C-alpha cells in the first residue's frame, strides 16, 4: 500500500529512503492515537485521505490493534466496536459525527484550510506536498505529549530543506542584524540561539557580545548544523545538537536567548517558553524573530491569521506572562516579526 501511495500520487518511484520515511511516519501517527476504542477520520484534498487511511490501517493491524475501515461515502450512525479503531476518510465522514481524532492532509494547492473544516480543528496536521516524504507538522495539545513523533518528524521536515534554507530566505541577514542590535544584548554575555538552523544569526550575535562573550547555537536537525559549518558559521559559535524542549544547560546560565521561528514549531508553546526561562538569568532577554511579518508569512503559505496563534499579540502576552517573562517589545511589521521579553 505504501508503494501504491507513491504510484497514485507521484510519477516518481518509491525509494528505500522514502519507504522508510513512510513507515516511520505511520508508526508515529499510530503512537499518537488514543488507546482502546477510537474514532479517527482522515480528511484533505483528492484521493489522498483514503490512501493514507488504508496505509494507517495496515500499520495498526500489524501492531496488533483491531481496525475497521467503514466503506462507502454515505455515513450512518456507525460506531467502532469496543477496543477497535474506526478509521474513516473524506469530508462526508468528517461531518457525520464527533471524532476522537481528525487528521488533516496539506497537499497540492489546498493544503492550508481552503476546504470546509480544513485544519482548524484537526488534532494532527500532515504535510503531504511531497507524496514520497510525508511529515507530521502539527499535533494539537491533547495529543502532543503522546508518542515519539516530535524529534523524528522535525528532523524529517528540516533535513530535506537544509541545503536550500539560506536561498529560500534570500538576503535577509541585515534584518537579523537590525533585530539583534535593537535588543541590546549585553557585551561579554552568554547568548544562546535556540533553533539556530544554518546559523544565519550567528555573525550578528557574535558581534553583539564581542570576543569576550559566548555564543552557543542549538538545533535538533544534524543537517542544519552541518550546513552551518559548511558556511563557516561555526567560527562564531559552539554548535550543539539538542532538543529545545530539554536544553542541556544549567538554570540561569544565559544572558539572552535568540529564537528565529522556533515558537511556532514547538508542540507546547508554554512548555517551550518555560524551558527558555529556566536557562535565562533574571533580567535576561528573550528575542523572538522572523525575517517576515506574520501576515506576510501566512500569505506565503496560503492561510489566514488566527487570533489564537502562538505569536498573536494577545496570545504571546499571556503565554510569556505565564512562563516567567515580561513582554516589552512587540513589532509585527510586514518586513519582520520581533518580540522581546525580559526574564522576571
Predicted segment positions?
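NTP-dependent small-molecule kinase module
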Residues: 6-7, 13-35, 54-57, 61, ...
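ATP-dependent NMP and nucleoside kinases share a basic, alpha-helical "lid"
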Residues: 79-117
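Conserved class I S-adenosyl-L-methionine
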Residues: 146-187, 200, 204, 227, 287-310, 315, ...
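Class I SAM-dependent methyltransferase SAM/SAH-binding core
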Residues: 192, 198-246
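A short acidic, Gly/Pro-enriched loop at the edge of an enzyme's catalytic core
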Residues: 245-256
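A short SAM/SAH-binding and catalytic strip from SAM-dependent methyltransferases
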Residues: 256-268
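A short glycine-rich, Lys/Arg-flanked "PGG" loop and its adjoining helix->strand segment in the class I
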Residues: 270-282
